[in-house]
Amino acid sequence: MYAANGCFYCHSQYIRDKDEGNDIDRKWGTRRTVARDYMFDQQVFLGTSRLGADLTNVGVRQTDPQWFYRLLYNPHTMSHEVSMPAYRWLFETREIQGQSSVDAVKLQGAIAPPPGYEVVPTSEGKALVEYLLSLKKNYPLPEAPETTE
């Protein structure tokens, strides 16, 4: 889902060394990314540019699936300066049958669904969020000591 939705065009998955950028200062990671970080990845997504945040450790920084669902549904509710498009095709609006779904996205204001309806992620939306939550390269490696500054 990450590749299919083109996330790698704007997001990278590598933390640059302190001498090469401010990734560590931005708290995107505590150490640089090294080749061993990608050893078990089926596909490596280094990225083609970095218009958005680096996602190497996004699963460490953000642990709530709701945060990702709200971001994907309407990025501008998270930040007005973001250039990320909405990925609303990863969601469906449906009538509430009995109780709300545990997966219902908590939306407010103009983007909230009408009364009696809820916005829920599709299986593709859930898969993308599960992938993003899994991005955690915060384990120690001898060839990339953590920066303590």
Task: Briefly describe each language-model feature range.
Residues M1-Q13:
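Sequence/structural segment immediately N-terminal to covalent heme-attachment motifs in c-type
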